[in-house]
């Protein structure tokens, strides 16, 4: 067997940069906002070399200001005191609702795709203004004031958006907790944020199942005297929902008491708009703080320029407002621009795998933004449904949440986009607020597997994690950092600014540390390697787990792979791969004769040889564990921490598993590791 030479960003040498298909240009409602790569480079260089001039122009063009700012930007990454648009006054709710309602009240704002399609509805900007004003009035009547936090625990329904905008309207701070979190997780976030008001619903509906949302809230807040009011929306109208007198109030009853217009409160640009809790390396969640002016501008600019969004477009972001994707690209980005946003309550599999494509056909969606996890699911079991529907309205296909592998990128382009759409593989995070690395649709040529180029104002760099020195030029790999502030970056961690500094600004002084590994290829394009703690070092070789995972996933029988590094006395670390297989093929309990006579040992041997051939002998997994499924968070990401602990024989130290969407797989994984790994070591 010939082992190919290992190259820096080696996969970049196997793909070509692709220009936007002609269909993209033919279907544009108007001229593109950025016309080509040269135009992007000119704008990008100005945003880096003259950031105050660049963002001053953008802020005045895209946002309505009640009072002008006196300085565009102050502070530094070194000191952790970054501020934008100082002394400027504005309101997020006004920017997202009022100005569009006044100009075009009958234009669709929210397109609600309910769990049951018979419950679908459209809310115009005029209706949205009235509904937001009423809930804002309720909160104001309860004494909620500027600077207070309000917790929102709602499924992906229009009322979640209404609640967020209502909180922002009165200058308060919303703290959305994903409605799939446990009672204990909800309690932790409510207490940490000091939220005295919680907004929830009686029950949720998802995938044809009913979720006892109010019951979870009651359990989580039992004994929490901090919470004085709970506003409950009737999602199902089921009778007998427990309501605590003096604390719990029905949404529809309280809203009916309020006027349908409440003037918005003028906020400082640096006033917090929201908190959003994200997992920390210590296991305790941290409340990331985003401010009003800078965040809104980042949301608007990336939605406009990355997706080439026009006012007539329809954006379908298949993400929940419980996560940053829903905040930025289902709510604040499109609504700031006055663009219709699809709010999707259900799952891609309910009532069948044609759901996404029916939504696109029904509403003539022009943009579809989804996580690779959902795409892998559809590719595995639901691909045949795509061709049944007319998806020709699509112009841009986005990917979010994790790097999308080149093969899945190609499948997305061919099967979903019919080779007519631009693929926008976007790299960003809760803390960045909006896109960091992403192609500008129609202007920047794309490469399968690459997030491509930095967005305006993102002064991206690659740092050697050992020396801390920036790596100049192309064909380099290291950790991804940003060396100057940008408007939508998080300003702090709620009540723990020291944690903010320690996590993001102190690891590489003068830089914002993303926590991700990355490579910059020969063309200057960025390839995201995943979290730095998902990089293993075997005998001095730094290996990206995503690189090994991609190699294993190329096998025809493999559905998905997750690679972790565990301690090894000889090599420092060794590679362990967990592999789930396609339906109809070998499963983790397979025996001789299953799956066309492919035995477990034969399959493991094939996969190891494949990695050796595609990357090098040093990257070969020491063992491959065959499992039925992998543990995932509720946002769809693989929880590699669990896999690492189990393979390290530390199953009793798994820590908090409340964010797992499928905790039932953990015992099976422990058993598989015991049978396939530890038992072999004992022989």
Swiss-Prot record:
Residues given in the record as ATP binding sites: 401-403, 425-430, 516, 531, 542
Statement: the UniProt record of this protein carries the keyword Membrane: no
Reaction it catalyzes: acetate + ATP + CoA = acetyl-CoA + AMP + diphosphate
Annotated disulfide bonds: none
EC numbers: 6.2.1.1
Annotated metabolic or biological route of this protein: Carbohydrate metabolism; pyruvate metabolism
Binding-site residues, CoA: 206-209, 325, 539, 612
Pfam families: ACAS_N, AMP-binding, AMP-binding_C
Covalent cross-link Glycyl lysine isopeptide (Lys-Gly) (interchain with G-Cter in ubiquitin), where: 506
Location of Phosphoserine modifications: 679
InterPro entries: Ac_CoA_lig (IPR011904), ACAS_N (IPR032387), AMP-bd_C (IPR025110), AMP-bd_C_sf (IPR045851), AMP-binding_CS (IPR020845), AMP-dep_synth/lig_dom (IPR000873), ANL_N_sf (IPR042099)
GO biological process terms, semicolon-separated: acetyl-CoA biosynthetic process; acetyl-CoA biosynthetic process from acetate; pyruvate metabolic process
Positions bound to AMP: 425-430, 516, 531
Free-text function comment from the UniProt entry: Catalyzes the production of acetyl-CoA. Provides the acetyl-CoA source for histone acetylation in the nucleus. 'Anaerobic' isozyme of acetyl-coenzyme A synthetase, which is required for growth on fermentable carbon sources such as glucose. May be involved in the PDH (pyruvate dehydrogenase complex) bypass.
Name this polypeptide is given: Acetyl-coenzyme A synthetase 2
Organism: Saccharomyces cerevisiae (strain ATCC 204508 / S288c)
Taxonomic lineage of the native organism: Eukaryota, Fungi, Dikarya, Ascomycota, Saccharomycotina
Gene this protein is translated from: ACS2
